[in-house]
C-alpha cells in the first residue's frame, strides 16, 4: 500500500484507507442520517445494526435474524455508487476430491494421476459454463457463473499424485437452489467417470448462501429511488453480483436492499478510497427516505421515478 491503511487520510476530496469504501463510508452515512432523524418526533423506530462477518459467512446477520429482530424494511449500505440494488447473487462452494494411485514417476503402468483427473473435470465443466452463459439472464444480475478457487495435490515432481482436491464456487441467481447446483456438478462428474479410466472422485458441498431479490416496485425500492431523485441523484436500479446480508433479512420477512456510497471496484483494493461527497449525499438520501418511510409515505413521486430508473 502507498497510504497508511488505518490513517484515514483526506486528499483531494477523498477518504483513503482500508475499508474506506467497503464499508466505513456507508456506516458513516447511515450514522449521520440516523443522528438527524433521531432529532425529530417521528412515529416508528429506526434501528441501526452493525453486524460482523459479512465478508465470509454473515454470522453476525444470521445471529441477528435468529434472535427475532425484524423490521418493515432494511437498507444495507454496501458500496453501490448510490444505485438502489434490490437483488444480489448467492453462492455455493463445492469440493471435489480425486483419488489416484501413488507411484514412482518412472512407472506410468502403476500410477494413477489424480491431478490429471482434476484437469479432465475442469475441461468437462466448460459445457456447464456455456449453458450458463446461454441461459436467460436475470434483468439485474446477468448470468450465473462458476470458477475454480483452489487446487491442491501432489507431493513431489517424481511421484504420481494420489490425491487432488479442487474447490469451486458457483455464483447463483434467485431461484437457483443448492440441490440443483450439486446435481449440475455431479452429473458432469458421473459422465466423466464413464469415459476416463480409474477416475475416482467424490463431490461434497461446502458453505452455501442464497441469492435474493425483492420487487422493483416495492415501497422500499420506490421510496429510495424517490429520495435519490429529490436529492439530485439519478435514480438507478442495479444488481449486486456479490453476496451480501440482504438474503437473510428477506428470508426472515424483512425486505432489504443495498444502497450506499462508493464503487465496489474500490473494495479490498490496495489503496482503497471513497469520495467524501458521496458519503454526504448518501446520508441526505437516507435521511429523506427515513422521514418518508416512518411517516408512511415512502413512495412520493414513485411512478415518475420508477419510469426513469427502469
Set out the residue ranges of the language-model regions.
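Metal-dependent amide/peptide-bond hydrolase catalytic core
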Residues: 86, 95-310
